[in-house]
A protein has these predicted regions:
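Vicinal oxygen chelate
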Residues: 2, 33-35, 53-56, 64-69, ...
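Hydrophobic pocket-lining residues within nucleotide cofactor-binding pockets
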Residues: 6, 16, 101
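Core segments of cupin and vicinal oxygen chelate
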Residues: 12-63, 110, 129, 148
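Residues that cap or flank secondary-structure elements
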Residues: 10-11, 96
Length: 151
């Protein structure tokens, strides 16, 4: 048995419309949307009465997917502390490679993203930053600045 691929990542959000706008600003497109409920989703989540509204987004290259989920029932539960700091245990961030870091950062900031530190350069390879995005998620943006991008 081996993993075939990473199918998608899920981000639970309070404001689904704002989250879709945030990630759409980075070029992601809506692949699907729906309301989910029933015995199967209760069993998968280990909770009763689960009702969610989801939007599935796809990256421009077609290889990555992000599921934005808004729980309608049971109620959302805030992380403590909220938002979680970068050194909190668990899933830390999602990183996207972008063309034009400045433009990508401007686009997400216009949609509520907050730059967490500074834009920094890692050697001669990447310019990158962390942005606090929808639901307090850490969204990393990285621009490949290598002259020879075959590495």
């Amino acid at each position: 048995m081996t993993i075939k691929r990473l199918d998608h990542t899920v981000l639970v959000v309070e404001d689904l419309e704002a989250a879709v706008a945030f990630f759409s600003a980075l070029g992601m497109t809506v692949e699907g949307e729906g309301q989910l409920s029933g015995d199967w989703i209760d069993r998968v989540n280990g909770m009763d009465g689960v009702r969610v509204h989801i939007v599935l987004l796809r990256t421009p290259d077609g290889n990555g997917r992000l599921e934005l989920t808004r729980f309608q029932s049971p109620e959302l539960v805030a992380q403590t502390p909220s938002p979680a700091p970068p050194n909190a245990l668990g899933l830390r961030s999602v990183m996207f490679e972008v063309d034009g870091l400045g433009a990508a950062l401007d686009a997400v900031q216009r949609r509520g993203g907050v730059l967490m530190g500074d834009v920094a350069q890692y050697e001669d390879q990447y310019r990158l930053c962390y942005v606090r995005g929808p639901g307090g998620a850490i969204v990393a943006l990285a621009e490949d600045i290598r002259q020879d991008r075959s590495s």
